[in-house]
Amino acid sequence: MASNTTFLFSTVTLLIILLNTTVSGRDLPAESSTNIAARLQSGGLMECWNALYELKSCTNEIVLFFLNGETKLGVSCCESVDIITTNCWPAMLTSLGFTPEEANVLRGFCQNPNSGDSSPAPSPKIV
């Protein structure tokens, strides 16, 4: 009976030492700034909220873009899409109800140098 208790005690002690060594041996990532004042002063958070607010105002343009194929997204709408997908939360558009494919189409359209114009494409020249 004493040998069973000794074996159990030794096993539990060894397990605790092994777990303690494993947990204490890994590097933890450096803490990001948890100070809310510092995050608010950085400007990034406000830029994201402003872009989200602007995106709300161009929802009709985006819906027409997907329903009718109209390529008349305004410059401010494209800037908002670009800010949200690159600087803020890449999945934010999907959380607003857009599929990942639609978010990629919007991002691709807005990153195109000719996007954001409301003017139609020039007609081809006849030679």
Curated annotation (Swiss-Prot):
One of its GO terms (biological process) is regulation of double fertilization forming a zygote and endosperm. Residues 1-25 form the signal peptide. Its main location: cytoplasm. Restricted to female reproductive tissues, specifically accumulating in storage vesicles of the unfertilized egg cell. It is found in: Cytoplasmic vesicle; Secreted. GO terms for cellular component: cytoplasmic vesicle; extracellular region; vesicle. Pfam families: Prolamin_like. Keywords: Cytoplasmic vesicle, Fertilization, Secreted, Signal. Belongs to the plant egg cell-secreted peptide family. Involved in the regulation of gamete interactions during the double fertilization and to prevent multiple-pollen tube attraction; mediates the redistribution of the gamete fusogen HAP2/GCS1 to the cell surface after secretion upon sperm arrival. PANTHER family: EGG CELL-SECRETED PROTEIN 1.2-RELATED, EGG CELL-SECRETED PROTEIN 1.5. This is Egg cell-secreted protein 1.4.
